[in-house]
Amino acid sequence: MNETNDIDQLIYLFSKLPGLGSRSARRIVLYLLQDKDVRLKSLINNLINIDKKIVKCEICGNMDTENICRICSSEYRDKSVIAIVETVAELWAMERSGNFKGLYHVLGYNLSAASRKNPSMLRLPELLTRCFAANIKEVIIATNSTLEGQTTAYFITEYLKEHPAKISRLASGIPIGGELDYLDEGTLSAAINLRQPFE
């Protein structure tokens, strides 16, 4: 089947999305093109809308329509507890569990020699400033259970030693090598409830 370069380019772009290969990308493109006046235009309009409206929260790093996200500005959140997550995907996963009512701090990365991510790329100075300014009582390290996530967790623990907050880690239930975004809500809820002091 010969496809135009524009279609090939669209298939290529979709195939770069997480979890999609070239076959799935081709199916998506065909689905969109079969009713492009409705499906494709709706997708385009939504993407343009998101591009214009979505910003990174100035406090935690979440993505929202406001400079200070709904979580950080909520009066119903426990402002004495911060969960440190690697990316917004993990923040959203914890929110889906419905079990965590504190605040978040998105690092943006984990420490990884392979991908050349180093401590200076993490948002740790901002975290320490938040901990002191908001009188944080507990910091929950909610990094993934991968080697990089564990390394990042240990580094954060050392970094926060000068702050008196209790430092805890999500409990078992998260498999070694597992990523929060792929866990079901029940497993993540149990991990939040059974979190343990970080040693």
From Swiss-Prot:
In terms of PROSITE patterns, this protein maps to: RECR, TOPRIM
In Gene Ontology terms, what is a biological process of this protein? DNA recombination
CDD domains per the record?
TOPRIM_recR
Q: Which UniProt keywords apply?
A: DNA damage, DNA recombination, DNA repair, Metal-binding, Zinc, Zinc-finger
Single GO term (MF): DNA binding
Q: Where are the zinc fingers (C4-type)?
A: 57-72
Q: Which family does it belong to?
A: Belongs to the RecR family.
This chain's function reads:
May play a role in DNA repair. It seems to be involved in an RecBC-independent recombinational process of DNA repair. It may act with RecF and RecO.
State the name under which the record lists this protein. Answer: Recombination protein RecR
The taxonomic lineage of its organism, from the top, reads: Bacteria, Pseudomonadati, Pseudomonadota, Alphaproteobacteria, Rickettsiales
- Primary gene name: recR
